[in-house]
């Protein structure tokens, strides 16, 4: 379904540890927005929803809702750090178009 690079796993683990709270997992969602129509949303959740698909990535639980699941199939998530900033990036084989900033896509 979705692959996290070592850099992404390390970043997610750091973020979970910094909350000081029990975290059920990282919610990855596709929602409307951005200049190409769809964008990724990430949020640490204390509990999952009934219809979530739970994906284990080396001990990190990903919470994926049923509407987002087909759009995330085959996605690779990375965490990059540069002089311009840091953040998560996504390579999505399902995307037919993406905007210049890399923050949104179309299927």
From Swiss-Prot:
List, alphabetically, the InterPro entries matched. Answer: FeS_biogenesis (IPR000361), FeS_cluster_insertion (IPR016092), FeS_cluster_insertion_CS (IPR017870), HesB-like_dom_sf (IPR035903)
What GO biological process terms are annotated to this protein in UniProt?
iron-sulfur cluster assembly
Which Pfam family would be a valid example here? Answer: Fe-S_biosyn
Q: Which GO terms describe its molecular function?
A: 2 iron, 2 sulfur cluster binding; 4 iron, 4 sulfur cluster binding; iron ion binding
Family membership noted in the UniProt record: Belongs to the HesB/IscA family.
List the PANTHER family hit by this protein, alphabetically.
IRON-SULFUR CLUSTER ASSEMBLY 2 HOMOLOG, MITOCHONDRIAL (PTHR43011:SF1)
Query: What NCBIfam families does the database record attribute to this sequence?
Result: iron-sulfur cluster assembly accessory protein
The name this protein carries in UniProt is Uncharacterized protein in nifU 5'region
The scientific name of the source species is Azotobacter vinelandii
Q: What is the lineage of its organism?
A: Bacteria, Pseudomonadati, Pseudomonadota, Gammaproteobacteria, Pseudomonadales
